[in-house]
Amino acid sequence: SAITILYSIFGIIYCALLASKFKVSLLFAVLQVSFYIVQSVLYKNWGEVILNSAIVLPIILASIISWYTGADKKKEQVTKNQLKNYEWILLAVIFVVVAISFYFILDALDTQNAVIACISCAFTAAAHYLLLRKSQYMFHVFIGLNIVLFILWLLPIIQGDGFGIESLPMLITLVVYSISNIRGIVNWSKEKKASLASVT
């Protein structure tokens, strides 16, 4: 469908810019998430609709402000944050609370594959918290999210529910996301080493 194609196009552009032009990529993330919400409505993945509308889109918009205001205007770099111990505890609590609460919400909405969907919601909340905090570990959590989402969108094909082959662009985009996140890990590691070298 046109929605799936547009989602994939904006998603691939987002991925292409993710590692090297992260702040610019967030602008395409807004478009990508918007089309993803529409796509999720068509597939009746209500967990994705609720979470992306109420949490992910606002977090990305807040992240755009955070990343642009935190940028070094000369180096075009952003100060990365090291999460404190209490934040990791908070992140774990967020993951568990979102997973459990969304399971009951999705079950009440008679959502297919509710268990996978609620795990996806938990990964989404955790990944975007790390995005907002400008943590390098967001890439690792986003890879986990991509794997869960791949399973979530693959299941309708396996189960023979509705859209079938129309899910393929979605699956391809998720693979591209994972590759891009791996690039992000490598890129940020290089930046960290360069930063440490300049200090010493």
Label each PLM-derived region with a short phrase:
Residues 16-27, 129-141:
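Membrane-helix interface "capping/anchor" motifs
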Residues 34-43, 87-96, 144-156:
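Small-residue-rich segments of transmembrane alpha-helices in multi-pass membrane proteins
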Residues 1-7, 48-57, 110-121:
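Structural signature of hydrophobic alpha-helical transmembrane segments
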Residues 97-111, 118-139, 151-154:
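Alpha-helical transmembrane segments in multipass membrane proteins, preferentially the mid-helix core
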Residues 1-46:
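N-terminal topogenic module of multi-pass integral membrane proteins
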Residues 131-199:
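C-terminal transmembrane-bundle signature of multipass membrane proteins
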Residues 31-70, 76:
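Hydrophobic, ordered structural segments
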Residues 51-63, 82-106, 120-123, 127:
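Alpha-helical transmembrane segments of multi-pass integral membrane proteins
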